[in-house]
Amino acid sequence: MTQMTVQVVTPDGIKYDHHAKFISVTTPDGEMGILPNHINVIAPLQVHEMKIRRVSEDDRVDWVAINGGIIEIKDNVVTIVADSAERDRDIDVSRAERAKLRAERDIAEAETTHDINEVQRAKVALRRALNRINVSKK
């Protein structure tokens, strides 16, 4: 069976390293499905839920919360360099819920003071928190 190596690397180290037969990521241009022997690519990534179908007898699917970064595909090695990333099993849901509430509060405060930059920053924080919450439920 043809397979590829998938690695997710953050400033804190390697967060994921397994063999897969399919992965799905989100770029600014939309969702991209990747199979073994994919053409070489480098692309930016959005905040998203990365789906990884591992090479295993039980057809296991892993989910990783990706908080921006880049993807490089070369010679059946997929490397994602992300600002931060967490596997579904490693997400602290209560921490993510607190981050969501904090971001919602920050958005409301920034909108009342018409601070556009703070609104945008808080919306990114909210998107990241929601992404982590969604991945934790997979």
UniProtKB/Swiss-Prot annotation:
InterPro entries: ATP_synth_F1_dsu/esu, ATP_synth_F1_dsu/esu_N, ATP_synth_F1_esu_C, ATPsynth_dsu/esu_N
Keyword terms: ATP synthesis, Cell membrane, CF(1), Hydrogen ion transport, Ion transport, Membrane, Transport
Lineage: Bacteria, Bacillati, Bacillota, Bacilli, Lactobacillales
Localization, UniProt: Cell membrane
One cellular component term from this protein's GO annotations in UniProt: proton-transporting ATP synthase complex
Assembly and oligomerization: F-type ATPases have 2 components, CF(1) - the catalytic core - and CF(0) - the membrane proton channel. CF(1) has five subunits: alpha(3), beta(3), gamma(1), delta(1), epsilon(1). CF(0) has three main subunits: a, b and c.
Similarity comment: family membership: Belongs to the ATPase epsilon chain family.
Superkingdom, natural source: Bacteria
Single annotated GO MF: ATP binding
Record protein name field: ATP synthase epsilon chain
